[in-house]
Regions:
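Short amphipathic recognition helices of helix-turn-helix/homeodomain-type DNA-binding modules
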Residues: 3-21, 74-119
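Short polybasic/polar patches that bind polyanions
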Residues: 22, 26, 54, 84, ...
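Recognition helix of helix-turn-helix/homeodomain-like DNA-binding domains
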Residues: 38-44, 49-50, 56-73
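Core residues of bacterial helix-turn-helix
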Residues: 45, 55-56, 86, 140
Length: 288
């Protein structure tokens, strides 16, 4: 059964659409898309609306109405040419599609399948299951040892909150990159459910922090398959001796969970695996 957006939900989605498209226009120069820069000084950075319309093969009026979120311009047919014009990624194109659609997508609950339960029993890896708002809902002993999740309050189980706290203690470019990725994942989920109370509560609680606010206002959108790199673990670990270990981290989507995924982190070398094993054993003994 189709569930149409309420007027409030529609207005929230269109506001996100307008902001996102403006940010993407501002991020592109004419030379980036094969257009002449011209001799006139530009009052605003990036592409102008007529230039996007030209690249998309639609009228300037139609693109303007689309960017402004006007009902009569809300068509899935123009998303593809506009996405090409703005050089959108697949995740960004899907985000725009979610904001434009008239129906709300059903949001299934996050269920822990038996195979995932077995994975959570593996203490050679750090395994954390997060919901679509990046709040940890299940984790294994290795994750408890590394991230102190067993002792964390409800707020501190959220990855955006943990990023902000870690960055305030020790800012670095690598950590900022991870924060941008998490925020982009969160943005992607918010496009499906822009009025969600839990999501908006999380954002409101973090807006007072300048770093989060600056990254949030960039309006970047990311997908899990973009996280394919080795990073120093971005969060303050259980033991400071683990801070210098390098990790491989991958996020895998959980089917039919509307954005929930499992994060699997493993040390990149034997020394790291040995140290993680030691602190996990110590954590298990303390919890017994």
């Amino acid at each position: 059964m189709k569930i149409l957006r309420s007027e409030e939900s529609k207005a929230a989605a269109r506001k996100l659409l307008t902001d996102f498209l403006k940010k993407r226009r501002a991020a592109l120069k004419p030379a980036d898309v094969g257009l002449p820069s011209g001799s006139r000084l530009r009052r605003t950075p990036g592409l102008r609306r007529p230039e996007v319309a030209q690249l998309a093969g639609i009228s300037t009026e139609w693109y303007t109405l689309f960017e402004m979120g006007r009902d009569r311009a809300m068509s899935q047919r123009v998303i593809e040419p506009i996405s090409r014009a703005l050089r959108l990624t697949e995740a960004e194109r899907e985000y725009v599609s979610d904001l434009v659609r008239a129906e709300l997508r059903p949001q299934p609950t996050l269920e822990i399948a038996p195979a995932l339960c077995r994975l959570l029993e593996d203490d050679e890896k750090v395994v954390v299951v997060v919901d679509r708002w990046l709040t940890a809902v299940r984790w294994n002993a290795a994750a408890a040892a590394l991230l102190s999740l067993d002792a964390a309050d409800e707020r501190s189980t959220n990855l955006l909150w943990r990023f902000q706290q870690a960055y305030a203690l020790k800012p670095c470019p690598e950590l900022e990159s991870q924060g941008r990725f998490f925020i982009g994942i969160f943005r992607r989920a918010l496009g499906r459910d822009p009025l969600n109370r839990e999501a908006n509560r999380i954002v409101a609680s973090l807006r007072s922090y300048p770093t989060f606010r600056e990254l949030w206002e960039r309006h970047e959108v990311h997908s899990l398959d973009e996280e394919s790199r080795v990073l120093r673990h971005p969060f303050r670990p259980f033991n400071s001796a683990l801070d210098e270990i390098r990790y491989f981290t991958i996020g895998l989507p959980i089917p039919a969970s509307a954005g929930g995924h499992v994060r699997i982190t493993v040390p990149a070398d034997d020394a790291g695996r040995s140290l993680l094993r030691q602190v996990t054993s110590a954590q298990t003994l303390l919890s017994a």
